[in-house]
Design a protein with these regions (language model features):
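Flexible, glycine/threonine- and acidic-rich loop/arm segments that mediate assembly and lattice contacts
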Residues: 1-114, 123-154, 164-174, 178-181, ...
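Glycine-rich, aromatic-lined ligand/substrate-binding cores of catalytic
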Residues: 197
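Short acidic-hydrophobic, aromatic-tinged amphipathic segments that line or gate anion-handling sites
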Residues: 161
Length: 325
């Protein structure tokens, strides 16, 4: 208001935003029979199992994070959540190019694109970028002053993590009749000849058109690349009452030992709330984490979406890129 000695000052209050987080519990057991120990020259397989526990847990936690990201990008409960999915997803018509990453991060976060620091991609995508000399290998200097290249690389200054567990889905893309490998779409009641495919068989379809007979598609693989920034996903080791324990059954299979492992973790994507709309037990499965109905953009909590205030989606350094290589 105008401070003129006669205008009343109007007070306003801040809204409180709410974020739901979820604890994910997982368990695993490994067993070794006494007989295996006896017939292998006293080889203790349980020692080998113990050495693999951390690696196994890392793999399970990675699956959990990928399921969470899938769920985040499947949000559809309100307009603002859908806007996040749209603005933070870039669909490349073909393989990655030199400008793909910069364009995608700018689309997602605008001036905040500088927050992005990690790129998770499939090896096929990484290979394509390497062939374009877009991946720069990190270097280190040893104690003798010799500079060597590391296996780790960076793209536009962002660390690249290569993992073939990233989604790579076979499906169909839009094409022209002249496109190499293109097939013609025919009606479902037609008998396809060479170079043709029934409309109902074009699945999954990655194009953006309303498919109909006499159109053309081309089979291919759609790769999903995730770009994350500092603080994109918060992590907390919640712990279990008994994380590790050994059990012995002297009768089963002539005697056997079992190593039990339990753990509970919390992965919370910044600016995204877990709502537990569809969850059968106290710990969500990866399928439930991947369900977009369980996620929503953080907001002020009003029952009606029209009355809510939402976090600015540009503050969330999470982006997704679809490409064909």
């Amino acid at each position: 208001v105008n401070y003129d000695g006669q205008t009343d000052i109007t007070a306003t209050s801040l809204k409180t935003f709410e974020q739901g987080v979820v604890v994910v519990g997982r368990a695993k057991a490994w067993v070794e029979r006494d007989f295996s120990y006896d017939i292998t020259g006293k080889q203790d397989f349980m020692d080998a199992v113990a050495a693999q526990v951390a690696e196994y847990k890392d793999g399970i936690d990675q699956d959990t994070i990928l399921a969470i990201l899938k769920g985040v990008f499947a949000m559809n409960s309100d307009a603002k959540s859908k806007e996040f999915v749209s603005k933070h997803t870039s669909d490349v018509d073909g393989a990655m190019t030199a400008t793909t990453l910069n364009t995608a991060t700018n689309k997602a976060c605008g001036a905040n694109k500088k927050k992005f620091s990690l790129v998770f991609m499939h090896s096929d995508v990484s290979t394509g970028l390497e062939n374009l000399n877009l991946i720069e290998r990190l270097k280190y200097t040893d104690k003798d002053g010799i500079t060597r290249s590391l296996d780790l690389g960076s793209w536009n200054g962002k660390l690249v993590v290569v993992d073939d567990d990233l989604p790579a889905e076979e499906g169909y893309f839009d094409a022209a009749e002249s496109t190499e490998g293109a097939v013609k779409v025919v009606a479902n009641d037609a008998t396809p000849s060479a170079g043709e495919i029934k409309l109902s068989a074009v699945t999954p379809y990655f194009g953006g058109k309303m498919l109909a007979a006499n159109m053309y598609v081309v089979p291919g693989i759609r790769y999903t690349t995730y770009v994350l920034g500092d603080g994109a996903v918060s992590y907390e080791d919640i712990g279990a009452k008994v994380p590790y324990e050994m059990g012995r059954d002297p009768a089963k299979n002539g005697g056997q030992d079992t190593l039990y492992n339990r753990w509970r973790d919390c992965f919370a994507p910044f600016g995204i709330s877990y709502e537990k709309v569809s969850q059968a037990s106290l710990s969500p499965t990866d399928t439930e984490l991947a369900d977009g109905a369980n996620w929503v953009l953080v907001h002020s909590g009003e029952a009606q979406a029209a009355k809510r205030s939402y976090i600015n989606h540009k503050a969330i350094p999470i982006a997704r890129i679809f490409s064909r290589g």
